[in-house]
Amino acid sequence: MIIPLHSTVSRRTALRGFGVVGLTAAAGLFATSQAHAASDLVVIDQKGTGPWGPENCGPTSAVIALVAAGRRVEHYVSGADGSAKGGNSRAVQEMRARCGLSPWEDPAVKTVDYTGAYLEDLEAGIRDTDGTATHSLFKEGLEASAHGSVVILHVHHGRLLGEDADYGHFVVAQGEDADGNLLVSDPGRAQEIGITGYSREHLRQARQGDATIVS
C-alpha cells in the first residue's frame, strides 16, 4: 500500500520512511555509474527480511550504517550471501525489535501504529547496538558523508530514482566515487543498483526529512 505524501497528510506522516511499498523495480534514471572509489558501505536487501520487508528500509539502513561504521551487528552476514535477498533477514528483524517497531518474541507483530519508521526509531536501535546516532539536518548529513562519515538520509524515493512514486525512504551514504558523487547504498534497490553515486544536488532535490550520522 502506498500512502501519498500530499498536503492532506500530516507533517509527522511525511517525515516517515515507508520503504519500497508499491514502487516498481528499476535502476533509477538519475543514478550515475556504479561507484568506483573505496567505501565501507555494504549492500543489504530489505526485501525478504520478514513479514514487514516492504517497509523495512529503516531497520535495514540501520544495519548497513552500523556495519559501515565498524560496529558489530549480531547475526550480520557479509559478502554475496548477505547481500542476496533474505541474506540478512535475521539481523534486520532483530534491528526492528531494537528500534521498537516489533516485539523481540514475534517479528510478525508490530508495536507501532504506522507504516515504516522514523529516524528517531532508527537512532534508538543504533544506540541499543552500542552505536552513536547524531540527528542532523539533511545538508549537514550530505557534508558529513562527503568527508567519510556514515549517514542515514531520509529521501523521497520517487525523486531519488526519477520514478512515479510518492513516499519517504531511507538510504545510507558514505564517501564519494571517482566522479565526486556521494556513494549511496539503497536497501530498496539492493539487487538492481546496490551502491551508486549521486550528485549532491540530486540528493538535495530528493530530500524528504533529516539525516542521522552514525559512528
Give residue ranges: language-model regions.
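Active-site-adjacent structural segments surrounding the nucleophilic cysteine of cysteine proteases
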Residues: 2-112, 157, 164, 178, ...
